[in-house]
């Protein structure tokens, strides 16, 4: 038990000549530098930052004298205590043969005249960064370890241009002077005070003195005032003639002193600013041999060749400055994190990106996008909408058809002279959502029987109807046709003029009625009804509409064409003979029908034969000259014409040899009730065949291209892989040599370097 108490007491007693370990910071200064001990647990990086904030750096004891000063400062610390010093080594930078073993000082160099390693150098790959720490007890040797571990404290070093000695104790002084260093360490146990330190002296008389370690005009560094520091009163009411402060001497004399940042002028009373004309690049402080000293801001250090200039310090060379990535720039550095990590608030550490941060970023991005879209909507003007429907396009594979054109003289309601002609080229598909119309009506021109003109059915008052020349189906009878008036037939020979007979037929089915019949129903007063041309005959308007009974039927017969005359002669002679005297009318010219001119009349049965019966003159309505009416545009109905007509539309220009529109009478539309013919069906078949050609072309073009490519590949193959030498058998390439020694002199000698008696040839396997 006694032995244990003795050992505990020995461990508690400090070693001889060494300062005991205290938890308070302390410092030891020399003529050119100061070392300060801060017993606070820090990592290497944190310790380096703490020293930089105070204007210094981690301790770099390069000489034995500096090492001895460090030993006296550390004294006796804990048995296992460690203190960081300014030595570090980067990964894979081992140099065991050098004094510092690959370590460098935090100042960036490897110059040293002193080392104190605790362990010998070893050969190794040095895969990680290492930092050096000083033992707090014993011989204060250097140990290397991980830079991220926190140790018991750290040592800082502060360099200055000069230092002032400690003030001696004077008579009348209340106690030792208290010094405040530039690195904010307050103590009264300094032997040397760095440049810029302040000494506070307390006198017994109640007054004190404050001194500043500054540069002297003669050179060097000294205190701003010399003793005695505790004089009697003698400044008087005018402050002793001093500009700033007046100090009374012991013998009653007074001395002047300047405030911080100023120095006493040569007259001893006024004060001047030493940094007003100092050539410092960044910061200037009064003091020093020249009255001022230049300092650099954080991130810079004084240049070695010129103390007035400042150069950048590469902080990224210090191990552990940043947790992941470090970027150095002039005057500082910045830490970055790899993908998936984010920088913490301290600006050094990195942590994995959390879900809350990612969600906040996404919300911010969505908010910015929403704001951008709202801005675009506000800037985009609204388009004006007139409230009308847009006409849809028809089916793309159905080509729009146009009503036939029979030339300029046969168009109704010609424009006046000088009025420009306009082409009405519009598609014929019906607009969407259109109102229901009446039954479909079409006029059919048959190519197998003579043309019959009937004017007993006028055009219905609809803007969507047009006369259609169709060869596909017979006309449909209207539901409520308007009242109709007969028209005068074209002029023929007098010997063939047979009067018409008006007869009343009962209502019969379509198949039991006479060959060509048009029914007349009670008249009604429709709106304006422009006539529509359905054949090549001029249109003639009757002067009035004669009322007829509801059951009245009008049958119109045309005389047969004489055998000795062709249809062309009949129509041509009709231009020269006037109408009968009992049938008043207008002398007109009927142009040839393209159907009768190109297709001869075919024999028909008795039902389809044409007969005429004389009709009294009183029953024939007189014709009257036509009056021009505004043209009506045909829409929403297709027109199918026979193959003898051209599909192209004639231009609306006057032609020579054609009467003026004003002098040509017009006839009402003549709807034909002839049945479909083979010629019309062949026209539709030709149109369908024309549509099928595109499919054939679409199939043939790729096929031809493919055949051309195959032909080209075959030609290339034949030219590249031509005929080769015939293959030989294996017995033709080798032969047995039985008498190698009896080889005749006539046998050719094999070439030098080749196998004797072996023939080479190319064989195929």
Curated annotation (Swiss-Prot):
Q: Which residues lie on this side of the membrane: Cytoplasmic?
A: 717-765
Q: Which residues carry this modification: Phosphoserine?
A: 754
Question: Which GO BP terms sit in this record?
Answer: anatomical structure regression; endothelial cell apoptotic process; fibroblast migration; fibroblast proliferation; lymph node development; positive regulation of endothelial cell apoptotic process; positive regulation of fibroblast proliferation
The record gives the membrane topology as:
Single-pass type I membrane protein
Write out the transmembrane intervals. 696-716
Record topological domains on the Extracellular side: 18-695
Q: Sorted alphabetically, which keywords does the UniProt record give?
A: Calcium, Disulfide bond, EGF-like domain, Glycoprotein, Lectin, Membrane, Phosphoprotein, Signal, Transmembrane, Transmembrane helix
Relate the induction remark in this record: By wounds.
Q: Where is the composition biased (Pro residues)?
A: 622-633
Functional summary from the UniProt entry: Cell surface glycoprotein involved in various biological processes including angiogenesis, immune response modulation, and tissue remodeling and repair. Participates in pericyte proliferation through positive modulation of the PDGF receptor signaling pathway. Acts as a scaffold for factor X, triggering allosteric changes and the spatial re-alignment of factor X with the TF-factor VIIa complex, thereby enhancing coagulation activation.
| Protein name (database record) | Endosialin
Query: Which organism does this sequence originate in?
Result: Mus musculus
